[in-house]
From Swiss-Prot:
This is Co-chaperonin GroES. One of its GO terms (cellular component) is cytoplasm. Belongs to the GroES chaperonin family. One of its GO terms (biological process) is chaperone cofactor-dependent protein refolding. InterPro entries: Chaperonin_GroES, Chaperonin_GroES_sf, Chaprnonin_Cpn10_CS, GroES-like_sf. It comes from Dinoroseobacter shibae (strain DSM 16493 / NCIMB 14021 / DFL 12). Together with the chaperonin GroEL, plays an essential role in assisting protein folding. The GroEL-GroES system forms a nano-cage that allows encapsulation of the non-native substrate proteins and provides a physical environment optimized to promote and accelerate protein folding. GroES binds to the apical surface of the GroEL ring, thereby capping the opening of the GroEL channel. Keywords: Chaperone, Cytoplasm.
Length: 103
């Protein structure tokens, strides 16, 4: 099933966190927090301003993002648990450090 978010909403797949700490300790599932990083799966067309013009989205499909701990609504699409949230719930886009240094 294809899913297209409306307006300024984005569909996000959570990116799982590490299962070990830097010191080598294994973190049990019960102690893990839900990750606040995700991969943008789909984006809406953008909200409309007062004149009815579309406001372009800052994120695009494939962006790795950081969002608030309680952001979004959990939805199931094709048996996969995803999040749908407004673009304003996204705190930032995570870029590859090597690519950022080259720019």
């Amino acid at each position: 099933m294809a899913f297209t978010p409306l307006h300024d909403r984005v569909l996000v797949r959570r990116v799982e966190s590490e299962e070990k700490t830097a010191g080598g300790l294994i973190i049990p599932d019960s102690a893990k927090e839900k990750p606040a990083e995700g991969l943008v799966i789909a984006v809406g067309a953008g909200a409309k301003d007062d004149d009815g013009d579309r406001i372009p989205m800052d994120v695009k499909e494939g962006d790795k993002i950081l969002f608030g701990k309680w952001s979004g609504t959990e939805v199931t699409v094709d048996g996969e648990e995803l999040l749908i949230m407004k673009e304003s719930d996204i705190l930032g886009i995570i870029t590859d450090e090597a690519a950022a240094k080259a720019a």
